Amino acid sequence: MYGQVERKRVNFGKITNLDYLPNLIQIQKRSFDWFLQADVKDETKRKHQGLEAVFRETFPIESPNNDMIMEYSHYILGEPKRSPQECKDTDATFAMPLKAVIRLIIKETGEIREQTVYMGDLPVMTEQGTFIINGAERVVVSQLHRSPGIFFSYDMERDVFSARVIPYRGSWLEFEMDNKGILIAKIDRKKKFPATLLIKSLGHGTNEEVLRLFYSSKKEKIAGATSKDLKKILGRRTINDIINMETGEVMLEAGSKVNEDNISILKEMKVKEVELIEFPKGKDNPILINALEKDGVNDYEDAILKFHSLMRQGEPSTIENATTELTRLFFSPKTFDLGEVGRYKINSKFEFNNPKEFSGEKARVLRPADIIETVRYILNLFSETENYYPDDIDHLGNRRIRSVGELISNQLKTGFSRVERVIKERMTVQEIETQTPQLLISIKPITAVINEFFGSSQLSQFMDQTNPLAELTHKRRLNALGPGGLSRDRAGMEVRDVHYSHYGRMCPIETPEGPNIGLILSMSSYARVNDYGFLETPYRTVKNGKVTGQIEHLTADKEEYHYIAQASGVIDEKGELKNKLISTRHRGDFPFRNPSEIQYMDLAPLQVVSVSTALIPFLEHDDANRALMGSNMQRQAVPLLREEAPFVGTGMETRAAYDSRICIVNKHDGVVTSVDAETIVVERKGGKESDTYSLTKFKKTNQGTCFNQKPIVGVVHSEINGKVSKVSKEKIEVTGENGELKEYVLQIGSKQYAPIVSSGEEVKRGTTLAGQVVVGEKLDEMGNILVKGTVLADGPAVDNGVLALGRNVLAAFMPWEGYNFEDAILISERIVRDDVFSSIHIEEFEIQARETKLGPEQITRDIPNLSDKAFRDLDETGVIRIGAEVKPGDILVGMVTPKGETDLTPEYKLLHSIFGEKAKDVRDSSLRMPNGFEGTVIDIKRFSRENQDELPAGVEEMVKVFVARKRKLLVGDKMAGRHGNKGVVARVMAEEDMPYMEDGTPLDIVLNPLGVPSRMNLGQIFETQLGFAASKLGISFETPVFDGAEESDVDNFCKEANLPLNSKFKLYDGRTGLPFMNEVFCGYIYILKLAHLVEDKIHARSTGPYSLVTQQPLGGKAQFGGQRLGEMEVWALEAYGASHTLQELLTIKSDDMLGRARIYEAIVKGIHSIKPGIPESFNVLVQELRGLALDIIITDSEGNTVDISDYEDEYSKSKKKIKFETIENA
């Protein structure tokens, strides 16, 4: 690309700094690296996480009779057998073999049998953060789910608080108040009992012990107390049992209220003082005491036995059984797991901070202290104690991300638990002498769960590959649905709504419209996931009113306690906040605070929104609903034949294209030495090694768009034969054979070229003189980009390393003859002629030759009963040639299938013996071009068993044919801008008839001005105006979101370009040459062509398939279905009195089987009268009513009974008759 000068880019951003932007697909790659730990050199020293944790939690496995034990040492990862591209071509899975070193120890002899056991193939993530499963590229979407831990909630209707202990795995424990005012505990939402029973089962056996756990007490005098003092005691509760020392009788139970009778009894007993409960705020809150009265036990043993009898009804209760059951429920790592996250949440909630106590397996189970603190917290909530609040379950501190690594781990745990069961069974069955790890381990359960997860899980999705942005967004998506998540039907408004804790973590704009709104979200640009799975966002730290250069990432929980200034806060030269009062964010409020009270400041205005939303220029002038549509529609833009970067962008385009990994990025510093359409060679610094980069050419994506890479770096070739006369950093001079001097400059714009030849060297025309200097990519440990590598080749929808989803077109906002009514779009014929919005789409067609019972199918050119014309583009093997133009019905691959052998006549046998195979019974089963498809064959892929290709069982040969088609813009295609301004092409008009400007420039596109005010997306107006200035000045603008160009900036550039400040121009009618009455707003707007192409949707049916039960035509283009005539269409026909049309539509054109047969007969014979019969759906209704035991009798207009079976007989007769007559007439 020598000599090509890039457009100058002007950035309006004052604050936005993309250097701190994390690697945009980091969430996928980091999570998978965490799971696999492939880069750990010593395999025996991997951390207890991911795959290693799955092995460690499964092993060791002890045999049921304790005579042997199986231990795990470490796992080994092999190399994938095929490259990602080979996997796509052969419909294989990109996976690596997983092996584990397993030891079987025989206890009696101490013998150790060690083996490396193959554990199956594990799908591997590609460089792009995707998986290739059965040849298709898939993405595992991160799940947003409720974090494990303890949560307190408030039920407004019942005015009660409840607590819920949610583990990562295991039984749920809940505390709440029932209708009788008793604090109850629930296990797994089934078993219900007083909460105090559980507390007593933990070792606090008596009522007094329980009360002392939760309440403080105060001793009050009775002996010698005045009546005034005694009045204060009345109504208060005792903390301990008051016992008559002489008789041993309990006079007053712990928790009982003191009344006048009690006082007189206590005086008689000569009790000097009583110890009374000090309730918080002095409020008597009896829910715990009511539970004590209800539980009916007063020591540990009774409590734990009663607990066991409730949990295991019908089983004998012993102390041992009861203790085991309680341990199993909450205190055993095998059955209960809070996870690191759950423990972290509990510790931060109750401010536990003893690190020794929370290490290893102990940290992941509940402790008695956790249960006691939970009850204490709920009692404080009921007492309205200060600093005790219920949790907000929609707060991002209580919702976490389960990324790909964690999701695969959870699946493997299921598979490994099944493997454990199989191993234990085999240990008891097989002879101890012959047992080895290989024989004991069955890998089928592991393979099954891996295949199930990647193939059919709700979170493993077919990648949206329409364009690079769609791909990038899919990898950054957060899904609240899926296993263990929410369900679409039950999710309410609260969980879908934008929450203040989403700020900087999840985009408040980008979410689907429809039933999934608010459940499927996108990560904000700067957000990252921490080790616990919580989303963090970066802030600049502020100390004593001065903004430091330090950056800190905060979770939603930590952010709660701080005042955070906006990124747009005014800072002086010293870095101090200027104003006396600064607008801040604090929880859900926006208070003004002194600079000294501020601890953090936003990093960039961009950090609120996702990548898609950050690509919308002048977003601040758009309504949120339209911005949502704009974000979503950019992902549907089809990559065009000729890409063009927007005149008005946001600066995010370069980073989005770079991080999507669809461009080829240079790995090491060096110089480009060779460039062609398929390879780029870069010689590394030092000249000892070189890297060769292969480009992907015209491959089909998941959505059928074209994936093609084009080099954008270059070399300098000599244009003459001669000798190099001078070499310097600035230029190379070559003296030709005839003495002419040719000069080559080595600095063009931002591109620097380095000489490859030396002075005095002989060169020929085409010899490489110099290569472009390129920079290698450098990443940090987290995978973030420290130095961006030079982009060597553009991918689809990328222009010179800049994301280019659409084209800049000259637009006017004016109505034109109603052709842009209701958002329709009028476009110029130039757009179609010059392929401005043309795109390439690729379809794949596949055929398999199988082994059948009657013999093998054969791919051949020798197909019976076809003309020579049908074979014109097939090669000698029966496969179409590359470059052939194909239309519907054309043969792509010729194939014959053997027919069933019939009793052969003597004549046939004679012919067979004379002509051999020709007359043999074969059926044409060739692969033909389906209806509605045409194009050019661009590639053929053949696989056969003879060539040792891996094929599915029973398949002998497989051929794939790729057909490409250039699609020009058509009437009916959907187009859109970046501001949610969408419409359908209504008319393609001759260029000379389009309105034109005073200098004679015809418009490219005419949009309806009425689409702007009501939609409130004024961003398109600013974009159009600035776009015109960019076009005139030959530059591009970057206006970052919430930090972009102001009105004054737009005006200044319009002045510089000699454009009117209101961007209104005098336009002339192309048909008459007369000027329009008013001036019209014009400029350059960036328009996308969306994947909703009219050719994929338009469809017509003559006759086709019918539903088996109702006999009505099927629906949809895929089934070659009919058009539904609904209730409202029936009303319309009734209103017009079109009775015959209506009857025809409801009977013979739909499900009147006899009528259909008769009309066919009538058409064949040329008869024009028809008599409709009974629709088949009526018969279905009758049978359904009979199924409900209703006696249905059908009568005609005269009251005579009609038998439907007669009608069916008539249908079958008429069918035979028609068949016979048709053959006869033929």
Curated annotation (Swiss-Prot):
The keyword 4Fe-4S does not apply. Keywords: DNA-directed RNA polymerase, Nucleotidyltransferase, Transcription, Transferase. It catalyses: RNA(n) + a ribonucleoside 5'-triphosphate = RNA(n+1) + diphosphate. It comes from the Bacteria. Its EC number is 2.7.7.6. GO terms for molecular function: DNA binding; DNA-directed RNA polymerase activity; ribonucleoside binding. Gene3D superfamilies: 2.40.50.100, 2.40.50.150, 3.90.1100.10, DNA-directed RNA polymerase, beta subunit, external 1 domain, DNA-directed RNA polymerase, subunit 2, domain 6, RNA polymerase alpha subunit dimerisation domain, RNA polymerase Rpb2, domain 2. GO terms for biological process: DNA-templated transcription. The keyword Disulfide bond does not apply. InterPro entries: DNA-dir_RNA_pol_bsu_ext_1_sf, DNA-dir_RNA_pol_bsu_external_1, DNA-dir_RNA_pol_su2, DNA-dir_RNAP_su2_dom, DNA-dir_RNAP_su2_hyb_sf, RNA_pol_bsu_bac, RNA_pol_bsu_CS, RNA_pol_bsu_protrusion. GO terms for cellular component: DNA-directed RNA polymerase complex. Coiled coil: none annotated. It is an enzyme of class 2 (transferase). Belongs to the RNA polymerase beta chain family. The RNAP catalytic core consists of 2 alpha, 1 beta, 1 beta' and 1 omega subunit. When a sigma factor is associated with the core the holoenzyme is formed, which can initiate transcription. HAMAP family: RNApol_bact_RpoB. DNA-dependent RNA polymerase catalyzes the transcription of DNA into RNA using the four ribonucleoside triphosphates as substrates. PANTHER family: DNA-DIRECTED RNA POLYMERASE I SUBUNIT 2 (PTHR20856). This is DNA-directed RNA polymerase subunit beta. It comes from Leptospira borgpetersenii serovar Hardjo-bovis (strain JB197). The lineage of its organism: Bacteria, Pseudomonadati, Spirochaetota, Spirochaetia, Leptospirales.
